[in-house]
A protein has these predicted regions:
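Conserved C-terminal "switch" segment of AAA+ ATPases
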Residues: 28-33, 115-118, 124, 133-177, ...
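Hydrophobic positions in the central parallel beta-sheet of the AAA+
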Residues: 4, 37-39, 68-69, 104
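Conserved nucleotide-binding/hydrolysis micro-motifs of P-loop NTPases
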Residues: 12, 43-45, 74-76, 109-114, ...
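Conserved catalytic/switch belt of AAA+ P-loop NTPases
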Residues: 74-124
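Short glycine-/polar-rich loops that comprise or flank the Walker A/P-loop
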Residues: 32-35, 65, 98-102, 123-129, ...
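Short glycine-rich substrate-engagement loop in P-loop NTPases that contacts/grips substrate
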Residues: 33-63, 85
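Conserved P-loop NTPase "ATPase switch" module shared by AAA+ and STAND
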Residues: 39-40, 63-82
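Walker A/P-loop
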Residues: 2-34, 58-62, 127
Length: 204
């Protein structure tokens, strides 16, 4: 089997890499269709006894020939009052049943994923590949910003670039600052400020 674990903080491109991987595996004829079914706790746990197993089964059915991407799987067991344990047991069973048709990728925070696997040995033994997604450095964040600007057909001068690097460096000192999402929010904020400025100039 090729089931995987992606551990990293939010915004480190885990979902993006999973989507790219699904296309590569389709081209290499490892996967038949190469699509990706993304889900979290709210998509896997039913409200009543017996519902959860059916929901999990339907997700595996939908992912046949592709990847089932389960984000923050540890949240399934964090709330003891729900049917999370039933979801985990069903996932383990379906990983076996669909091992030739579905690749499961579990993703989430490094520490929580480690704990999660320690509590679920049956699950841990079925995961063949562990990929770690480190936080981005200020240089990498600025490079991501450059790519986003290019895609949006914007440019920034060197002075603005230095200011952005400084903002990214400050952000990196914070815990869980958001990585790529932080840069996306920074760019969105800058575009809104620019639009606001242009409207005011036009009115004057």
């Amino acid at each position: 089997s090729m089931h995987m674990l992606f551990s990293g903080n939010p915004g480190t491109a885990k979902t993006t890499v999973a989507r790219l991987l699904s296309q590569v595996l389709k081209e290499e004829e490892v996967l038949k269709y190469g699509h990706i079914v993304e889900c979290g706790r709210q998509d896997l746990v039913g409200k009543y006894v017996g519902w959860t197993a059916q929901i999990v089964e339907s997700k595996f059915q939908a992912a046949r020939g592709g990847i089932l991407f389960i984000d923050e799987a540890y949240s399934l067991v964090e709330d003891n009052r729900t049917y999370g344990a039933e979801a985990i047991n069903t996932i383990v069973q379906e990983m076996e049943n669909y091992r030739d048709e579905v690749i499961v990728i579990f993703a989430g925070y490094p520490e929580k994923m480690k704990e999660f696997l320690e509590q679920n040995e049956g699950l841990a033994s079925r995961i063949a590949f562990h990929l770690n997604f480190p936080d981005y450095s200020p240089v990498e964040l600025t490079q991501i910003l450059d790519l986003m600007l290019e895609k949006s057909e914007y440019r920034m001068d060197e002075r603005t670039r230095e200011k952005c690097f400084s903002i990214c460096a400050d952000a990196c000192r914070e815990e869980n600052y958001g990585n790529g999402r932080f840069v996306r929010n920074l760019l969105d904020h800058a575009i809104m400020r620019q639009a606001d400025r242009l409207i005011r100039e036009h009115q004057n």
